[in-house]
Amino acid sequence: DSDTTWRLFGQLEWRASEHWLIQGGAMYEDTQLTGNSLTPRIAVNYLINPRHGLRAVYSEAIRSPDMFENNVNWSYRVTGLSTPVYGQNSAQYFVKTRGPGNLDQEHMRSRELGYNGYFVDQALNLDIKLFYDEITGMISEPLRNNQYIASNSNASRFAGTESQLDWQLSRADRLRLTYAYVHAQASNRLDQRLTASNSGSAGWLRNWGQGWSSALFYYGDSALNGYRFERVDTRIAKRLALGSKTSLELAGTLQQRLDHQPTTFADNLYDSRHVVYFSAELEF
């Protein structure tokens, strides 16, 4: 089987007046397996002044089922049989899974009310939003060989708030804070458990001079699929000037888990609670 997907998208912005800014966009998608769709986005911004604004946003999105979900033809071949079958040491497992072949797209509708403000004297940027998202036609069935019956019969709703604070404490120091609260409702209990009710982060970034910089971040959520998540990331970097417009950044990052929980699923367990990796970035 094969699939071909074409997408076309565009965006339009209209400055209606000194205080009103209208933004609109749309994406057209044509998929061989599921047909075509048009998803719009419109945002109305009211600028109280150049540094403070309110916004109302409505958008739609789709997710087309992948080829595995829609057209799977799945079975196992067993080898090394202790008792040969028809003189053969291998045989096809009796369970065979086939996709329905007629799945529709998942549809998401999102509504948002938000505020963004920059406080010059404090060098502080604040963004707060309220949102309500709903997904219909969800394909929620787990991909199991013995009981996979895919359908578009599930739905989810998410309501909550998100906030972000970016504070330039000094020329060298910067503080970032985020927090999100989500109330999730889903027809399939497995979908509902995959959303944490409370999550957030706190970070301190510092420029030490002479190309040295560091970042210290804490990430946490209350329960992701029933498991708490807490981690601290430490990053140290050195930027080397290689020319007037060329530079090389060498960095090392340590990720330290503060909990003893799996990541989302019970069998997602790391051998070590800390991970170290290095990176190199060339800009020219």
Residue ranges of model-derived segments:
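Hydrophobic, lipid-facing positions within transmembrane beta-strands of outer-membrane proteins
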Residues: 4-10, 26, 38-44, 99, ...
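Conserved C-terminal beta-signal and adjacent last beta-strands/turns
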Residues: 56, 167, 171, 175-178, ...
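Residue-level signature of outer-membrane beta-barrel architecture
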Residues: 13-14, 28, 36, 46, ...
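Gram-negative outer-membrane beta-barrel transporters
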Residues: 15-21, 124-139, 151-222
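Transmembrane beta-strands of outer-membrane beta-barrel pores
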Residues: 4-6, 26-32, 58-64, 71-73, ...
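Surface-exposed extracellular loop regions of Gram-negative outer-membrane beta-barrel proteins
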Residues: 1-45, 172, 176
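Membrane-embedded beta-barrel scaffold of Gram-negative outer-membrane proteins
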Residues: 47, 55, 87-152, 157, ...
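Outer-membrane beta-barrel translocator domains and adjoining extracellular loop/strand segments
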Residues: 1, 34-40, 67-73, 80-81, ...
